[in-house]
């Protein structure tokens, strides 16, 4: 950040007002994405992003987040503090303007912030509007100021309450339970975002403290993040369990046409592309022009180097852009003065000029790296050739999947017991472990809207398999065909084509034992790597069959955990010395059709767990660790999470 920008005065005059706040409570999803878990956590990100803006401007080094015991959130920073002087146009404190007017903030005054992710004032005023209670405290100019709000309305004027030798802003808010589906914060979700921010902003101290939970030492559970390595460290974290084929992470940063570009990348022995893109610290899940620019620059530069070095002379088929990205893990971070995001939740960058800026930056810096590191360059090109060879084989296998799919009209898998309903939004398919359990499920289901596809044994571990092996696997081919999806769209020959998807509920149903959990994980890994769009759209679920059946005469009750079993046994005994029959279900096949319907299939009674991806970064890391080749990280993960496991006696 330039000294000119760093020293720019940040006062009430810098706060610009664009529009009012009335619409936020009426249509919250327009501003924070949704009113579920994602939107709830988005409130925290908006407040934290304001503190990050201060850090980007060179005025903040510590940001601390607290989940309080009542599920309210406190975010503190040691930045300059939101201005409290009288706003000339509004005639009231700039702090009140920032907290109560949408699009009011220093972000819109280029002198205050060169770039900004969280829209300073937009985010925090949205948070205020969607909170039942909010309190802001500002330490600035040797004084402490405060103001409190209820559903966005000030309860009194900004007031001075003391003196201080610190600077910073402290915000505490409680999400409005009348707006959000639930108001319980998830420590792991917030932790993943703060870790991400620490990598993207090296040298900044971030912490998360959960005042609802005490650790083994009697202290509040706390996570602290600071990264000195930045994006290089981020890529190593993402790639922790994969085998790198290069001797170090490739890193470069620079600026082109006023767009600062930072890239860290490495190639590994896996077969998947794992690229994460950010604009002003915002995770752009859907990519955008910066990602397009990166891919264009990468492909063009590697292709030119490979052609000039003569390494492609013996390759008899065309190499595609995808081949240059197989086994690539990369993080791209750009800073854009006036970002144009497609969609209110900022997930796709639309600035056309960024494509050329990023493409040129990547080309220039990667060309230099390849010339300076010929041995590493040759390893990358050999990886590309291997990817192209495998893709050629995979294309034939994919074509088999497409030919066998419902789109070609050649029929559905013989093992599929389909439903009669044809509206996908009303249909559900159960992927059932084994033929015997599949038989029970077929008898117990509602044939009108429930389909059953039995899967034989453990499906292929796609994390360790080349693409053509995946598409040649019989069980996987059956899943593609039964679901009605295929590979390849007009825009991308490798993209999932969901135009003919036949079910909007895809339910994984396996035994409630270790083997069943392993099979469910294999299926989830397949969905994450090859049908991720179904997960992102909320179409993938996990069934929860009961673990126990308790019997006392004609009284029969099901329970889903050991704790629930113990409570029910005590309740059914009623203080008397009577025997309670306990049946442990180790497999779905041990239940008859009626029991399976009552507990697991009946929409009125069952519990389905929807599979979601709160953090693509964390999901990728966990799948790679659980299903990859490295044993020590997997063992450490299992030991750390052993308390959540169900162990069969």
Predicted features along the sequence, with ranges:
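Conserved short strand/loop->alpha-helix "switch" segment adjacent to the catalytic nucleotide/phosphoryl-transfer site
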Residues: 26-45
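Helical (often loop-to-helix) elements that flank the catalytic cores of nucleotide-handling enzymes
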Residues: 88, 342-354, 558-564, 568
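C-terminal interaction appendages of subunits in large macromolecular complexes
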Residues: 389-408, 423-428, 439, 443-445, ...
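Short adenine-binding "F-helix/F-box" segment of the Bergerat
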Residues: 87-88, 95
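A short glycine-centered beta->alpha linker in the GHKL/HATPase_c
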Residues: 81-86
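GHKL-family ATPase ATP-binding module
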Residues: 1-14, 21, 45, 53-55, ...
């Amino acid at each position: 950040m330039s000294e000119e920008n760093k020293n720019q005065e940040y006062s009430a005059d810098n706060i610009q007002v664009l529009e009012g706040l009335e619409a936020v409570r009426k249509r919250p999803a327009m501003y924070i994405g949704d009113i579920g878990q994602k939107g709830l956590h988005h409130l925290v990100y908006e407040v934290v992003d304001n503190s990050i803006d201060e850090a980007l401007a060179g005025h903040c080094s510590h940001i601390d987040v607290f989940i309080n015991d009542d599920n309210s959130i406190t975010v503190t920073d040691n930045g300059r503090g939101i201005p409290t002087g009288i706003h000339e146009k509004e005639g009231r404190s700039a702090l009140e303007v920032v907290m109560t007017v949408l699009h009011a903030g220093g972000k819109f005054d280029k002198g205050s912030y060169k770039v900004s992710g969280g829209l300073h004032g937009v985010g925090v005023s949205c948070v205020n509007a969607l909170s039942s209670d909010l309190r802001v405290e500002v330490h600035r100019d040797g004084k402490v100021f405060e103001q409190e709000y209820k559903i966005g309305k000030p309860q009194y004027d900004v007031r001075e309450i003391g003196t201080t030798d610190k600077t910073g802003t402290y915000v505490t808010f409680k999400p409005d339970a009348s707006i959000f589906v639930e108001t319980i914060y998830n420590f792991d979700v917030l932790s993943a975002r703060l870790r991400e921010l620490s990598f993207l902003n090296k040298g900044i101290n971030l912490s998360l403290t959960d005042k609802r939970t005490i650790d083994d030492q009697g202290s509040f559970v706390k996570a602290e993040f600071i990264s000195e390595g930045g994006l290089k460290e981020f890529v190593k974290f993402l790639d922790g369990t994969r085998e790198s084929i290069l001797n170090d992470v490739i890193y470069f940063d620079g600026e082109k046409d006023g767009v600062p570009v930072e890239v860290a990348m490495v190639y590994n022995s896996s077969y998947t592309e794992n690229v994460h893109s950010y604009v002003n610290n915002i995770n752009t899940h859907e990519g955008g022009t910066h990602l397009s620019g990166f891919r264009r620059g990468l492909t063009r530069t590697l292709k030119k180097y490979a052609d000039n070095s003569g390494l492609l002379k013996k390759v008899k088929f065309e190499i595609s852009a995808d081949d240059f990205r197989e086994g690539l893990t990369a993080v791209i971070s750009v800073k854009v003065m006036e970002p144009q995001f497609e969609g209110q939740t900022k997930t796709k960058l639309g600035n056309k000029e960024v494509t050329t800026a990023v493409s040129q930056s990547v080309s220039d810096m990667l060309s230099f790296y390849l010339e300076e590191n010929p041995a590493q360059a040759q390893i990358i090109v050999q990886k590309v050739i291997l990817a192209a060879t495998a893709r050629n084989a995979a294309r034939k296998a994919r074509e088999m999947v497409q030919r066998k799919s419902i789109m070609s009209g050649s029929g559905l898998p013989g093992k599929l017991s389909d439903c009669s309903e044809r509206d996908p939004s009303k249909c559900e398919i159960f992927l059932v472990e084994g033929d015997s359990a599949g038989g029970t499920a077929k008898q117990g289901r509602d044939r009108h809207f429930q389909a059953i596809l039995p899967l034989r044994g453990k499906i292929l571990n796609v994390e360790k398999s080349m693409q053509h092996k995946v598409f040649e696997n019989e069980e996987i081919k059956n899943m593609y065909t039964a679901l009605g999806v295929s590979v390849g769209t007009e825009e991308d020959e490798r993209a999932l084509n969901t135009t003919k998807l036949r079910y909007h509920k895809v339910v994984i149903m396996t035994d409630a034992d270790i083997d069943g959990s392993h099979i469910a994980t294999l299926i989830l890994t397949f969905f994450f790597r090859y049908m991720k769009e179904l997960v992102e759209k909320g179409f993938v679920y996990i069934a929860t069959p009961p673990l126990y059946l308790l019997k006392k005469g004609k009284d029969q009750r099901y329970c889903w955990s050991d704790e629930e079993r113990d409570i029910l046994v005590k309740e059914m005994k009623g203080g008397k010395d009577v025997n309670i029959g306990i049946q442990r279900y180790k497999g779905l096949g041990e239940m008859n059709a009626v029991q399976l319907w009552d507990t697991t299939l009946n929409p009125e009674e069952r519990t389905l767990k929807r599979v979601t991806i709160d953090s693509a970064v964390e999901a990728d890391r966990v799948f790679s660790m659980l299903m990859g080749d490295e044993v020590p990280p997997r063992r450490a993960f299992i030991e750390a999470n052993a308390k959540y496991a169900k162990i069969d006696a």
